[in-house]
From Swiss-Prot:
One GO molecular-function entry: peptide deformylase activity
Coiled coil (UniProt feature): none
Protein name: Peptide deformylase
Gene3D superfamilies attached to this UniProt entry: Peptide deformylase
Family from the record: Belongs to the polypeptide deformylase family.
Gene Ontology annotations of biological process type: co-translational protein modification; translation
Cofactor(s) needed: Fe(2+)
Record organism: Rhodopirellula baltica (strain DSM 10527 / NCIMB 13988 / SH1)
Cofactor: binding comment: Binds 1 Fe(2+) ion.
Superkingdom of origin organism: Bacteria
SUPFAM superfamilies, sorted: Peptide deformylase
Length: 201
């Protein structure tokens, strides 16, 4: 079944993703699908849990264009060594149309691996640093509007309620599975790629 972008308040968006311990052809294919979706919807980054995969992987390209810049696929990312502060507008493909001003470190170090197992250890600044922090937040179950403060959140509350109503409607009609089924699906993905057991939700 092809991957698709899930929308708030789907529970996988709040799930803390586990590190990947296995890379196979299917995982590489899913990374390609994630890049396709990111470019299709004019994004600059997409985390695995945004396509209902509870694994620590994200894709990114700060240009948002397939034929420009570099397409990144990062496994098991970690960020540290934050420096400086910068505030800028962010949006999210899982809450399309919503934006907020988010304060983040201006410079961070990214560590992780690519699909070939090569280690990544790179200091990033500016927009790419912001993109990476946004995606790693996703993998930790954090969305950008969790970081915008009470005043900014008040501006979005009505729109977030609309997303909740739409989600509940789709779950009611069966186009989105119930919570128990979604938890089981996450556990199966974790067992396949993170060494988790199918008893974990």
């Amino acid at each position: 079944m092809p991957l698709s972008i899930i929308h708030f308040p789907h529970p996988t968006l709040r799930h803390v993703s586990r590190p990947i311990v296995r890379v196979d052809a299917k995982l590489k294919s899913m990374a390609d699908e994630m890049l396709d979706l990111m470019y299709e919807f004019d994004g600059v980054g997409l985390a695995a849990n945004q396509v209902d995969l509870p694994i620590r992987m994200f894709v990114a390209n700060p240009t948002g264009k397939r034929d420009e810049g570099e397409s990144w696929v990062i496994l098991n990312p970690e960020i540290d060594r934050p420096k400086g502060n910068d505030t800028a507008q962010e949006g999210c493909l899982s809450v399309p149309g919503l934006y907020g001003q988010v304060k983040r470190p201006k410079t961070v170090r990214l560590r992780g691996f690519d699909l070939q197992g090569n280690e990544i250890n790179q200091v990033l600044d500016g927009f790419m640093a912001r993109v990476v922090q946004h995606e790693v937040d996703h993998l930790d179950g954090i969305m950008f509007f969790d970081r915008i403060g009470e005043e900014g959140l008040r501006d979005l509350e009505g729109h977030l309620e609309e997303f909740k109503t739409d989600y509940e409607s789709k779950q009611g009609t069966g186009s989105i599975a119930d919570e128990a089924t979604l938890a089981q699906q996450r556990a199966e993905w974790e067992a396949m790629y993170t060494g988790g057991t199918t008893s974990n939700g």
